[in-house]
């Protein structure tokens, strides 16, 4: 990919605006999960080491534009960054009216960009205001690269029109390099693991991967649809009857690996208003896919079947993982995902994992050190796999 990289630039005494993805859960005024913040730190530190004055911006949650609600404030993130950088990080809420007073070696965090009217609509005037704050713009938020918004794509266009520099940060560049390696020039055989509740949400991903992969392991509700397409009864399990022909079409393109044995619970034991909570008390039973009863809900891949699937994983040279293969939040229905996770860890192939549930599973089963690359993106990860253009990245390429 042809774009400027922050690592290649001289930033001495430059005011640098870095768009990060700092959209993290906040509970009781504190950061509840810091994975995205940890991922942003190397970029901020690199800019400081290069002698820059660093302005950081991000969104948090989904506030109503023009209505700055305290629950969506980035104040807890500023506190977190201050602690991790061992230096004060000032939160600036009036950056357009008062400007940003900053010197080299300092860090200022702009208040939630989604408080600004026109952010989501990629308002050109708003994008220009961001560009006016800096000498160099750094797009480092892969998780929002699929959105053409004022602080992601519009600001790059504004920088270009003003004759200023816009570039990719180290995190964004690493994401794109890893995904390109996995999707454009993958070592074969390539295998994908695709989980989730519905085929419809991963339909384009499955079609794209079917062209690349020798084998695809499907799990969760997606697997139920493929099992039904093979003529198996799936009982009371979640599946999509209107996509059976689509599932068969995908099976005609590549080898879809399905379990022979699954873990089920009786539908009557499940409170759908408290799904995972009620599953804690439900009985888990292993059954052949040929003996699923009308009240059975398939909730995991049985261990023996998961071990067979793991054998395929260990033989792959490239592995792409998106989605758990069972309700791993409940231990009785998590063994399949655990076995798959450990197989990815122990594989000698290049592995890339993405999606919030996937990263949560990696964290739960402590296999991160065996995964070659973990993508911070959710929707952006899927859209890249689908072959779609990411607007914020395209703007960087055009203006390189």
Curated annotation (Swiss-Prot):
InterPro entries: Phosphoglycerate_kinase (IPR001576), Phosphoglycerate_kinase_CS (IPR015911), Phosphoglycerate_kinase_N (IPR015824), Phosphoglycerate_kinase_sf (IPR036043). It is an enzyme of class 2 (transferase). This is Phosphoglycerate kinase. Pfam families: PGK. The gene is pgk. HAMAP family: Phosphoglyc_kinase. Keywords: ATP-binding, Cytoplasm, Glycolysis, Kinase, Nucleotide-binding, Transferase. GO terms for cellular component: cytosol. It comes from Psychrobacter cryohalolentis (strain ATCC BAA-1226 / DSM 17306 / VKM B-2378 / K5).
């Amino acid at each position: 990919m042809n774009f400027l990289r922050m690592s290649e630039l001289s930033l001495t005494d430059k005011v640098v605006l870095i768009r990060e993805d700092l959209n993290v859960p906040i509970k009781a005024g504190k950061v509840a999960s810091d994975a995205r913040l940890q991922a942003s730190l190397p970029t901020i530190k690199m800019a400081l080491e290069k002698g820059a004055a660093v302005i950081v911006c991000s969104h948090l949650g989904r506030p109503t534009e023009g209505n700055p609600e305290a629950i969506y404030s980035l104040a807890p993130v500023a506190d977190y960054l201050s602690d991790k950088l061992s230096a004060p990080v000032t939160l600036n809420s009036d950056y357009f009216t008062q400007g940003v007073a900053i010197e080299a070696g300092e860090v200022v965090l702009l208040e939630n960009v989604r408080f600004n009217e026109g952010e989501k609509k990629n308002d050109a005037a708003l994008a220009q205001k961001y560009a006016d704050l800096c000498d160099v713009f750094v797009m480092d938020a892969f998780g929002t690269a699929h959105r053409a918004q004022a602080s992601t794509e519009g600001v790059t266009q504004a920088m270009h029109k003003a004759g200023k520099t816009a570039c990719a940060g180290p995190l964004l560049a690493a994401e794109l390099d890893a995904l390109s390696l996995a999707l454009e020039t993958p070592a074969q055989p390539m295998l994908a693991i695709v989980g989730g509740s519905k085929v419809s949400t991963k339909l384009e991903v499955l079609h794209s991967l079917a062209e690349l992969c020798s084998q695809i392991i499907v799990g969760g509700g997606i697997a139920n649809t493929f099992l039904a397409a093979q003529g198996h009864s799936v009982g009371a399990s979640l599946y999509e009857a209107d996509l059976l022909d689509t599932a068969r079409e995908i099976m005609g393109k590549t080898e879809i690996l399905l379990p022979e044995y699954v873990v089920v619970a009786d539908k009557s034991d499940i409170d759908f208003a408290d799904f995972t909570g009620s599953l804690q008390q439900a009985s888990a039973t292993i059954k052949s896919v040929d003996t699923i009863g009308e009240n059975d809900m398939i909730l995991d891949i049985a261990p023996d079947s998961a071990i067979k699937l793991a054998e395929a994983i260990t033989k792959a040279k490239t592995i792409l993982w998106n989605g758990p293969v069972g309700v791993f939040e409940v231990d009785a229905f998590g063994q399949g995902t655990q076995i798959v996770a450990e197989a990815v860890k122990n594989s000698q192939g290049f592995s890339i994992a993405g999606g919030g549930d996937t990263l949560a599973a990696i964290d739960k089963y402590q296999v991160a050190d065996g995964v070659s690359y973990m993508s911070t993106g959710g929707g952006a990860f899927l859209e890249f796999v689908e072959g779609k253009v990411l607007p914020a990245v395209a703007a960087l390429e055009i203006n390189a």
